[in-house]
């Protein structure tokens, strides 16, 4: 497990405006919790706590 930005299949983050949607997205994917990271490296994006290793995360490189 790891703490990371959860990613869409094309290596794009899930942008957010609040914590509720991110917490649901993260927990639905097996994480302990999640929140909206404001003004982070990828803008306002969902950050998951203890996300399972089989769920894609944002990695260096382009979002396409």
From Swiss-Prot:
What SUPFAM superfamilies does UniProt report for this protein, alphabetically?
A: Scorpion toxin-like
Instruction: Respond yes or no to whether keyword Disulfide bond is given for this record.
Output: yes
Q: Name one Pfam family in it.
A: Toxin_3
Task: Extract one GO cellular component term from the record.
Answer: extracellular region
- Please name the CDD domains in this protein's record: neurotoxins_LC_scorpion
Spell out the PROSITE patterns in the cross-references. Answer: LCN_CSAB
Tissues expressing this chain: Expressed by the venom gland.
Q: Where are the disulfide bridges?
A: 12-63, 16-36, 22-46, 26-48
Gene Ontology BP annotations: defense response
Q: Which InterPro entries does the record associate with it?
A: LCN-type_CS_alpha_beta_dom, Scorpion_toxin-like, Scorpion_toxin-like_sf, Scorpion_toxinL, Scorpion_toxinL/defensin
Signal peptide limits? none
Whether DNA-binding counts among this entry's keywords is no
- Summary of the function given for this chain in its UniProt record: Alpha toxins bind voltage-independently at site-3 of sodium channels (Nav) and inhibit the inactivation of the activated channels, thereby blocking neuronal transmission. This toxin is active against mammals.
Q: Which family does it belong to?
A: Belongs to the long (4 C-C) scorpion toxin superfamily. Sodium channel inhibitor family. Alpha subfamily.
Written domain comment of the UniProt record: Has the structural arrangement of an alpha-helix connected to antiparallel beta-sheets by disulfide bonds (CS-alpha/beta).
The protein depicted here goes by the name: Alpha-like toxin BmK-M4
| Species | Olivierus martensii (Manchurian scorpion)
Its lineage reads: Eukaryota, Metazoa, Ecdysozoa, Arthropoda, Chelicerata
């Amino acid at each position: 497990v790891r703490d990371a930005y959860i990613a869409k299949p094309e290596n794009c983050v899930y942008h957010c405006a609040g914590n509720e949607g991110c917490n649901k997205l993260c927990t639905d994917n097996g994480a302990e919790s999640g929140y909206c990271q404001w003004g982070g490296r990828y803008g306002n994006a969902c950050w998951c706590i203890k996300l399972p290793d089989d769920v894609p995360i944002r990695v260096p490189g382009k979002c396409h």
